[in-house]
Amino acid sequence: MSRKRQALDPNNPTVRGLGLGALFNDLENQRRSRQATSPKTMKELKAQLQRDGEQWRDEHKKEFKNGNVKIFHPSPRSVADILEKYLYYGIIANDDEEMERGQVSFYDLDSGTYKASQRTLEKLATCIERSLTTRQLAEIRHYLFLDSHRLTETRTKWLIPVNNGIYNQHTHKLEPFSSKYVFRHKIMTNYNANATEPSFNGWQLSEWFQQIAGGDRDKLLLLWQTISAVVNPNLTTDVAIFLVDNGQGRTGKSTFERLLENLVGAGNYGSLKLKEFEDDFKLASATGKALLIGDDNNPNDYNRTSENFKSVATGENILINPKGLTPFNYRFNNFIVQSMNGIPRFSDTSDVLFRRFRVIVFDHQYKATAANKRIKDEYIKDQRLLEFVLKKALSMTPDVLQDTTESQEIIKDIKEDNDSVDHFIENYLPEMESTRVPITFLFKLFLATMDY
């Protein structure tokens, strides 16, 4: 034992002789008492804050000789100090610059995740002092911002927050939530180690996936990898999934989307189409979501820029500019799925953009029967099915999503449709027999083939 530890050891005879042993024991008992009485739920936290507020007012009241009592109210600084006694809070950031433009996040005792909800912070503050004004509430938030330390988001690939805990892919065990893990969101489906695939009047999810894949093993794998990436965005696959059909309807495309939404749960997915990624106000609504899903993108849309889309897909830092609020830095940690009846056009024709895409075609048309309607309305909402899907998804660790032949061919067509020069080179130059062609002639031929 080091000299320092020995000097502080309450069992040391010298320490006992000085009467410090009792002091150390008292401090240890206080520490254990605080741990035992610390709030375990948000309801308990609110009750504790109310008690602390009452205690502050009682300790600071002024009693006069005539029996009158004057009650003082805690200042914003005092309220912030009380909040800081109980909250695990900070700013999720990677460096000082992100700290300057970050948001105060706090550990939600009920969900096991960190939230950046100003409304919840203000509600907690009013548990201490109900008479706080809007200006004082803003002042309290500012004190919390100034006192915040840096929080590092947990991006460990094998730790996945689900509804009933944190699943460890290394140990295959469920761990309890803890403030030491900084997660912004979780999957709202329980992990059930005993989950098996249910059957609903003869319908099974695995057989449906086989129909979608049409016998293509790579496509079947991509379907399951998509679910795995939705469940665990920390895999950082750097790609987005495009679900495509030809617009005939009843292809199962929207049913697959609803399955993903049911799996992550209400409040954990956001609606954002391709064009809307470049809209500051709409992008702000997508923060804190596990899944960003865009339904029925218009194939006639022309996307002039895709910078935000690429940054979100790769988890890069973005300046978020919410309407009426202070701009802040944010790193998205989610998965993108987009649905469409045809591929929209892009002004960006670089490989940097197109290698972010994986395309899954839904070309099987289902009959409009009551039995098929139950698949979307009932079966894919069943918790037994969702727990089976989650269990299977957690057994997968795809660092790279399968690049199917189907996807490669469609991406090639997209590039040609979006890049007129590439289309010309691919379809017209091979027909030329001469190795020496005048530039003027070549340019006029290009204009003619492009219907200018």
Indicate where each model-derived feature is located.
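Feature primarily recognizes SF3-like P-loop helicase cores of small DNA viruses
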Residues: 2-102, 127-452
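Trp- and S/T/G-rich repeat-edge/linker motifs of beta-rich repeat architectures
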Residues: 106-109, 113-128
